[in-house]
Amino acid sequence: LKEINNTLEILDSNSLPFLALSPTDVDMPCFRSLAWQIRDALTKGLGFCIVDRLPLNDMSNCQAKTIYWLLAQMVGRPVAQKWSDGRMIYSVTDLGKPSGNGVRPDVTNEEQSFHTDNSYNVSPPDHVGLLCLQPADKGGLSRIVNMVSVMECMNEEYPRLISRLFSPYFFDRQREHSVLDKRTIFTPILSEDADGLRVRVSRNLIYQGY
C-alpha cells in the first residue's frame, strides 16, 4: 500500500494520462511481486484471482484506473477492448439497452451465461481483468467456472461429445470488425497449444452465429 500511495503522489505532481504509463516508469517491487503471483494463479493455479484490500475509498476513479493499468501491464500485455475505437479500458455499465446483435451484454441488465470474454475475436486475450469501482445496488454477481473441471465431468459422463468441442463452430462477431470482414468466425470451442488448453465459448454468440 505504501508503494501505491507513493506512486500516486508522484504521478499526481507529474500529470500524465494513465494510458501512457508503463511499469518501467514506476518503482514498485512489491507490487510487481503481486503481479507475478497473480500471473502464476492464472496460468498454473485455479485460473482466476481476486485482489482485494486496495484502498479504493481513498482514491479517485482516475487514480484507481492508474493502479489497475500498471498492474495489468505487469501481468500481461493489454489489448484493445473495442475494435471500433481501440479503447483499452472498457466500462461495464448498465445502459438500459436491449440485448441483440451488435450490443454487448455488459451494457444490459440481463443475466449472462457462462462465457469467455472476447470469444468472438480472431485473437482473444489470454487473461481478462475487472476493476470494480462501484458495486451494483442489486444483482451484478459474478460466477466463475473452471473449464478443466468441466472437461473432467464430461469425460466421465459424456466422453463422446468432447471431440465435437475441438471442431469448429460459428461465432457471431458482434459487429466488432470491418464492414468488409465476415460477420462470423469459424473456430473450435476447445484447442490445445504449448501453453495447454485454450477455451473460447459463448452460447449466445454461437446461437447468433447460426
Question: What residue spans do the PLM features occupy?
Answer:
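Active-site environment of non-heme Fe oxygenases that use a 2-His-1-carboxylate facial triad
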Residues: L1-F31, W36-Q37, K44, C49, ...
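"Short basic amphipathic alpha-helical interaction patches in structured regions
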Residues: C62-W69, V145-N146
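A short alpha->loop->secondary-structure connector
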Residues: Y68-V79
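A generic structural motif
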Residues: R77-S91
